[in-house]
From Swiss-Prot:
Domain notes: The cysteine framework is III (CC-C-C-CC). Classified in the M-1 branch, since 1 residue stands between the fourth and the fifth cysteine residues.
Record protein name field: Conotoxin tx3h
Record's keyword annotation contains Disulfide bond: yes
Residues annotated as signal peptide: 1-24
Tissue distribution: Expressed by the venom duct. Is present in all duct parts with a highest content in part 2 (proximal of the venom bulb) and then decreases in concentration toward the end of the duct.
Length: 71
């Protein structure tokens, strides 16, 4: 009788709780899709700090950390 109670507890309580954790991934995916809709200038402002590069004049394009922006 105790074994049946443990099995029921696992399937009726613990299993549904474990599957609810998987639903938390959806807002992150939606946020990533929204980021793709940004215009190129906004994307550049987000990506350049992430890549640890910066915008500079065309005279400084030889620097490895420089991302040359013509715009």
């Amino acid at each position: 009788m105790l074994k049946m109670g443990v099995v029921l507890f696992i399937f009726l309580v613990l299993f549904p709780l474990a599957t609810l954790q998987l639903d938390a991934d959806q807002p992150v995916e939606r946020y990533a899709e929204n980021k793709q809709l940004l215009n190129p200038d906004e994307r550049r402002e987000i990506l350049l700090p992430a890549l640890r590069k910066f915008c500079c004049d065309s005279n400084w394009c030889h620097i490895s950390d420089c991302e040359c922006c013509y715009g």
